[in-house]
Amino acid sequence: MKRQDISENQAKIVYLGIGSNLGDRKKNIEIAKSHLSENNLDFLSISSFYETPSWPDPKKPKFLNVVIKAKFCFDPESLLKICKKIEILLGRKKGKKNDPRICDIDIIDFNKKVLKVKNKLTLPHKFMHKRNFVLIPFFEIQKEWHHPIIKKILKA
């Protein structure tokens, strides 16, 4: 008989960043949010929409970004699969790094877990503390957050 870890199925607090810089950006984000909700994410808070220059090339179309705080009962890899599936469903094409895209869903934090799966997933998001397009909407819904790697409290 396999013994299951009880904490495995308990809800974890996760933060996701959703961005779009192609097509109807707001509609793309709303559709992504709807699909996330249908995939066992229980939204607790959603930031306002923030328009930001494309990074690292501000000549590319501007991004619209939001951050979501949610509860999720499964593991980080399951959440990553859901995010990638939604990006593809919305029409994201595999292109060069930082190319314009219809939908980009990033896991910013997964229950303060520190994880590195080579070329696949790093938690917390390795650049989250350096990017205003993440931090500004993040701080709208979470006034401070302890970064488990750099050991600093990030504040609005």
Name these PLM-found stretches.
Residues 18, 46, 66-68, 105-109:
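A structural signal for short, well-ordered beta-strand segments
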Residues 54-63, 72-81, 85-156:
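Flexible, gly/pro- and Lys/Arg-enriched active-site loops
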Residues 24:
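Active-site loop/short helix in cyclic nucleotide turnover domains
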Residues 27-75:
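Short, surface-exposed acidic-centric catalytic microdomains
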